[in-house]
Amino acid sequence: MYVAKFVYADYSVTLMVEKKKVVALLSGGLDSTLAVKTMQKQGFEVSAVAIKTPFCDFDCGRGCGFEIREKADNLGVDLKTVYLGDEYVEMLKHPKYGFGSGMNPCIDCRAMMFEAGKKHMEEIGAEFIISGEVLGQRPMSQFAPALKKIEKLSGLEGKIVRPLSAALLPPTDPEKNGLIKRKDLGMIRGRSRKEQLRMAKEFGIEDPPNAGGGCLLTDPAFSLRAKDLFKHIETPTMNDIDLLKIGRHFRLDKNVKLVVGRNKDENEMIKVLALQ
């Protein structure tokens, strides 16, 4: 909400004008931060959604949330955190668009994240969804055909705006409807961070963050463990997945796998997971 004041010759009128709302997928990295800043600069009220999966590359595990909450507070946006658990495991069995170089179902994964964002968009009456995706930055999910597949799979065709690269992409519904203008959208392409760092300086962002967390399923060694798990267990539990993240793993036969801790802390973690 903001105040608009109109002054005439002999009187003035003050109106309360409600800002248009958008939903942002917020990872905590620089790109999603810049996407939020760009929309705020254009006068939108931004509400953020942070997505966690069992395979997010965070040392603090499933309880992680403080850092992203701090990022949201610094940006002045509301934050909703969504954890994709069992439904993510089900998707991982047979992703519609397959895997990347590891066991990473990037297109299906992004579609699930946008579906979560779509629910929040509908709940708060937002106009569209934004993300920090950059055209050509990631090999599987950030080229134009993949971006289109993600929109279709999530039921958000025309409703996803990627502010950092939007001027290089086809017009979205918000642009066609006059909510945003192409001249205010970015033309960033590829893996270089030069333009993002320039924007960070412009927005007064000190110590720009790196990428907002990674995915363990892109790691070659972890992917081998995950493939072995899904090969031998039809529906792995969250404990099964957490065990993949620690120790040394030895497949003894089709029914037995040995997990050995590499230190006292890992042994304690294995004990806790085994007793649950």
Residue ranges of model-derived segments:
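ATP-dependent adenylation/nucleotidyltransferase module used to activate substrates
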Residues: K5-E202
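AMP-forming adenylation/ATP pyrophosphatase catalytic core
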Residues: L153-Q276
